[in-house]
């Protein structure tokens, strides 16, 4: 699936603009992580990782009241259009409910960055400048340590980047933040 097709699929399935921004953030984080983990990532590999980020929650509005169906409905709708490893990574980011445990680096990258994108956006919104460009990894790390801040962002899920991807937490945050800063206008921040 091309990026254009994936973006069209996303906008066909998701109407909430904040959810679309979340997908865009996860897409650029996944692309950055792919480059970080695969120094010589080819176009096919980059497209797969980007597609996972861009479509991982594309059925959210259809399944928000049935979390066990999240990603499985998407598979029914477009699974035949995606490479099997892309669809698996999408399902694995909801593995606590679907039973499809993350196996590959792509699976784990999506699982870890999903929560981090929200934490970074929340940090930007409380920053004095209220934008991503002024945000630093240190500022995000400080918020990461505050359990009362952005309570919906599961820290344990983000921190698995160290065990499963062998990327230190601060570097993981830096990679994600730098990626998101590049598309800050698209994210409204």
Please give the residue ranges for each predicted region.
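Conserved active-site and cofactor/substrate-binding residues in soluble primary-metabolism enzymes
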Residues: 1, 21-25, 69, 104, ...
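C-terminal binding/interaction regions
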Residues: 14, 139, 145-174, 178, ...
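Alpha-helix initiation and N-capping motif
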Residues: 3-7, 48, 83, 137, ...
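Short coil/loop linkers at secondary-structure junctions
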Residues: 40, 81-84, 168
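Alpha-helical scaffold segments in soluble metabolic enzymes
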Residues: 9-12, 25-32, 73, 77, ...
């Amino acid at each position: 699936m091309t990026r254009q097709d994936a973006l069209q699929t996303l906008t066909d399935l998701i109407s909430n603009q904040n959810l679309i921004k979340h997908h865009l953030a996860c897409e650029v984080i996944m692309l950055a992580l792919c480059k970080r983990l695969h120094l010589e990532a080819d176009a096919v590999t980059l497209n797969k990782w980007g597609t996972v980020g861009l479509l991982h929650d594309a059925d959210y509005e259809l399944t928000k009241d049935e979390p066990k169906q999240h990603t499985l409905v998407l598979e029914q709708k477009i699974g035949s259009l995606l490479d099997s490893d892309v669809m698996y990574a999408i399902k694995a980011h909801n593995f606590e409910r679907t039973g499809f445990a993350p196996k590959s680096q792509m699976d784990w990258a999506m699982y870890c960055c999903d929560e981090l994108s929200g934490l970074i956006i929340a940090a930007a919104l409380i920053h004095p400048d209220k934008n991503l460009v002024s945000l630093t990894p240190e500022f995000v790390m400080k918020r990461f340590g505050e359990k009362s801040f952005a309570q919906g962002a599961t820290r344990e899920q983000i921190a698995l980047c160290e065990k499963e991807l062998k990327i230190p937490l601060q570097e993981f945050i830096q990679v994600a933040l730098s990626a998101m800063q590049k598309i800050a206008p698209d994210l409204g921040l």
